[in-house]
Amino acid sequence: MGLPWYRVHTVVLNDPGRLIAVHIMHTALVAGWAGSMALYELAVFDPSDPVLDPMWRQGMFVIPFMTRLGITDSWGGWSITGGTVTNPGIWSYEGVAGAHIVFSGLCFLAAIWHWVYWDLAIFVDDRTGKRSLDLPKIFGIHLFLSGVACFGFGTFHVTGLYGPGIWVSDPYGLTGKVQSVNPAWGVEGFDPFVPGGIASHHIAAGTLGILAGLFHLSVRPPQRLYKGLRMGNIETVLSSSIAAVFFAAFVVAGTMWYGSATTPIELFGPTRYQWDQGYFQQEIYRRVSAGLAENQSLSEAWSKIPEKLAFYDYIGNNPAKGGLFRAGSMDNGDGIAVGWLGHPIFRDKEGRELFVRRMPTFFETFPVVLVDGDGIVRADVPFRRAESKYSVEQVGVTVEFYGGELNGVSYSDPATVKKYARRAQLGEIFELDRATLKSDGVFRSSPRGWFTFGHASFALLFFFGHIWHGARTLFRDVFAGIDPDLDAQVEFGVFQKLGDPTTRRQVV
């Protein structure tokens, strides 16, 4: 036929059997990729330190999605929460990966069958004897089935009625585990951070889908609407399907980037807004203040801060710090976190406590400035020493560590004080191993950043695809340059399928 690459899909335009075949093959490719990617990630994943080297630091992409749906154990004997397991059962990480690969193989065979046996009686209209699809009826069937799946997921899987539940955590990502979730039917169900909304929304949306599916199966569209929306044309289906997909892609890009109950920080890493707003820093200070109020010493109060909480309060875990095109995991950037050095508290020679101004998200470099409790600049690391008034040496700044590996250690040497002041710009200070992976010291984004960028990009692309195919199907007669009511048509553009011998033609 000699079709150009951008027009090859016309071969399945009037061929329902092979249209099904290529869609089944597409499903085979998607499921096969998911299963294969899961096996690859399991081969390279190190589960030994879920606190300082979690899945999102290692660049895992499909493991977090399995985990949020209730998979926590591996046939390798480890659990994502850090313990060991003896009998993970079929629904382990490897079991899910294997199920996807088996399903992919079955879809591959089904696609071949449908490609070979394309001319089935089910595709033939009894009234005309020609191949055609009852698209409104098919729409009703798909709506009904997707409604059943949606309702079933919310009713059984999420609630734990028949299933594991989903990953649920506290607001600071410290106590996450898989558990059953009760539907939230009140106004709290609309809070994107309330897990109960996931159950209730799936139940409600599934119910609506079932009812809408039954409606479309039992009620035929009015003739005017059928013709106006070109419901008999398969390209209408393509256009509206693309619309559904790009809308969903925009929504999940938002829930991933801004955070929600569906994207827990323990699985995907913190959001950039948690750094921007000092979210974890405030919680750490609240806990320390509570400890001091209970007559604990500063050292005791800081020592009770969970290492996991301190690690979230580090700019290297901010997904907006990694460039969009810097390949590799976070561990390949600043290195593998080994331990928390502790919280540095700086003081000048007059005994005032000084706070290092933290680096904003979109800065690569930032001046080292130390302010007192009132926000007044008291010390800095000057660019020009000749003009300096607030240098560490002049002000006599010292640093002492509380909690962590350097608990109780203090430094007054200006070079060391400046070193830790620079590191304090980046949040809590951690020892990072850059040798093991030959990490280059340049920040990388987390899977949260990749997912958002990918889905926002494809959503934009699919938006234009929706406009393109929607315009093509609505204005097909205009683009072809022919009155659709003409009895004969001979011009190239109006043929639905190139080389179709059934297209009526006559020599003019």
From Swiss-Prot:
Share what the entry says about its subunit structure, partners included: PSII is composed of 1 copy each of membrane proteins PsbA, PsbB, PsbC, PsbD, PsbE, PsbF, PsbH, PsbI, PsbJ, PsbK, PsbL, PsbM, PsbT, PsbX, PsbY, PsbZ, Psb30/Ycf12, at least 3 peripheral proteins of the oxygen-evolving complex and a large number of cofactors. It forms dimeric complexes.
**Known NCBIfam families for this protein?**
PS_II_CP47
Q: Which domain of life is it from?
A: Eukaryota
Where does the UniProt annotation locate this protein?
Plastid, Chloroplast thylakoid membrane
Please state which protein family the record places this protein in: Belongs to the PsbB/PsbC family. PsbB subfamily.
Q: What topology in the membrane does the UniProt record assign?
A: Multi-pass membrane protein
Q: Which Pfam families match?
A: PSII (PF00421)
User: By its UniProt entry, which HAMAP family does this protein fall under?
Assistant: PSII_PsbB_CP47
> What name goes with this protein?
Photosystem II CP47 reaction center protein
The record's gene field reads: psbB
**What binding details are noted for the cofactor?**
Binds multiple chlorophylls. PSII binds additional chlorophylls, carotenoids and specific lipids.
Q: Where are the transmembrane segments?
A: 21-36, 101-115, 140-156, 203-218, 237-252, 457-472
Main location class: plastid
- GO molecular function, a single term: chlorophyll binding
Its biological purpose: One of the components of the core complex of photosystem II (PSII). It binds chlorophyll and helps catalyze the primary light-induced photochemical processes of PSII. PSII is a light-driven water:plastoquinone oxidoreductase, using light energy to abstract electrons from H(2)O, generating O(2) and a proton gradient subsequently used for ATP formation.
Supply the alphabetized keyword list.
Answer: Chlorophyll, Chloroplast, Chromophore, Membrane, Photosynthesis, Photosystem II, Plastid, Thylakoid, Transmembrane, Transmembrane helix
Q: Which InterPro entries does the protein's record reference?
A: PS_antenna-like (IPR000932), PS_II_antenna-like_sf (IPR036001), PSII_PsbB (IPR017486)
